[in-house]
Regions:
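C-terminal "cap" of GNAT-fold acetyltransferases
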Residues: 68-107
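Conserved acetyl-CoA-binding loop-helix of GNAT-fold acetyltransferases
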Residues: 41, 47-62
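A conserved beta-turn-beta hairpin within the catalytic core of GNAT-like acetyltransferases
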Residues: 28-36, 46, 68-70, 96
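Active-site rim helix/loop that mediates acceptor-substrate recognition in acyltransferases
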Residues: 1-11
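Conserved beta-strand in the GNAT
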Residues: 13, 19-28, 32-35, 40
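OB-fold and OB-like single-stranded nucleic-acid-recognition modules
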Residues: 4-5, 15-16, 20, 43, ...
Length: 107
């Protein structure tokens, strides 16, 4: 786990009185592809703005690494039932008119 966090482009941790209550991180190439790999919030802190705060910080990071005319793709796969949260944060569901459904392979 520590190796994964160390190799992330950014890791954001939300605290309440020095207790970690949520975490999110981005992996990618640091230029055009950023992927929100994890967004985890302790259940008792869900629906209180913690996840949104973490997402906002991750989105800001991705915007800040954007090169002059290069589009940065910030991508994620959300847990089933969490689609509306990410739509409220500005993400677009796939598939859509521009993108296919995406694929995954577990190794």
């Amino acid at each position: 786990l520590q190796c994964a966090i160390n190799n992330s482009l950014i890791t954001v941790v939300a605290y309440d009185n020095h207790k970690p209550v949520g975490m999110g991180r981005i992996v990618g190439d640091g230029a055009v592809i950023c992927y929100i790999q994890d967004l985890i919030v302790i259940p008792s802190y869900q629906k209180k703005g913690v996840g949104r705060m973490i997402i906002d910080r991750l989105v800001k990071f991705a915007k800040d690494i954007k090169f002059q005319d290069t589009e940065v793709m910030l991508d994620l796969m959300c847990a089933k039932g969490r689609e509306e949260f990410y739509k409220k944060c500005g993400f677009t569901a796939r598939p859509n008119e521009k993108l296919g459904p995406g694929m995954i392979m577990y190794l």
